[in-house]
């Protein structure tokens, strides 16, 4: 699966804070639910979304998958993929997002995996972050949405739903805390951008 490397996305997330209220409102107006799978951000993205009053109607759950074993056992990421590529990989990020959505029973899954530092990891430089996004095929088609990367299709044998999932590469600067914060902002921006299509009756923001 090809990965879209958006320098502009990384720059925006470093320069401005994204408002999780917008994300929750957009999901709520569409009747969509969201779940998370976090590695380097370790629950910070979930916590940021949960700060919004009424987020419980949208945010159903999240998995902190810091270890490879948890990515495999709780998010159903392929053991072969993890062995071949390591945890910091575009396809792993996409699979994590699918795993979050299927495990939590949501329409959308978003994930984070990367190297926060201070040392490189698995041959990946500090600041290398992949964000994953997954959405059910039915929702994508019904709302006319477009994922921000070339996607692969995944099947879920349990729910019988089909998923589209892709990933986004961020090349971030700063210390460990700055990289983790920017990854959280990037995750919020990724979902917000995905939901930019305005359904009938939803007022435009700004």
For every predicted segment, state its role.
Residues 1-206:
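Short alpha-helical segments enriched in small residues
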């Amino acid at each position: 699966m090809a990965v879209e490397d958006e320098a502009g996305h990384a720059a925006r997330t470093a320069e401005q804070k994204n408002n999780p209220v917008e994300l929750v409102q957009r999901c709520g107006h569409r009747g969509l639910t969201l779940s998370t799978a976090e590695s380097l951000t370790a629950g910070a993205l979930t916590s940021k979304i949960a700060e919004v009053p009424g987020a419980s109607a949208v945010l159903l759950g999240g998995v902190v998958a810091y270890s490879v074993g948890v990515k495999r056992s709780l998010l159903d990421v392929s053991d072969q993929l993890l062995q071949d590529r390591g945890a910091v990989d575009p396809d792993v990020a996409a699979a994590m997002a699918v795993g979050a959505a299927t495990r939590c029973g949501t329409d959308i899954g978003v994930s984070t995996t990367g190297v926060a530092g201070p040392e490189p990891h698995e041959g990946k430089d500090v600041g290398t972050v992949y964000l994953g996004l997954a959405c059910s095929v039915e929702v994508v088609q019904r709302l006319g949405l477009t994922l921000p990367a070339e996607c692969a299709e995944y099947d879920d044998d349990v729910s019988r739903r089909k998923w589209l999932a892709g990933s986004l590469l961020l090349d971030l600067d700063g210390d460990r805390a700055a990289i983790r914060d920017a990854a959280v902002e990037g995750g919020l921006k990724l979902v917000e951008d995905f939901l930019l299509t305005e359904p009938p009756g939803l007022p435009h923001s700004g």
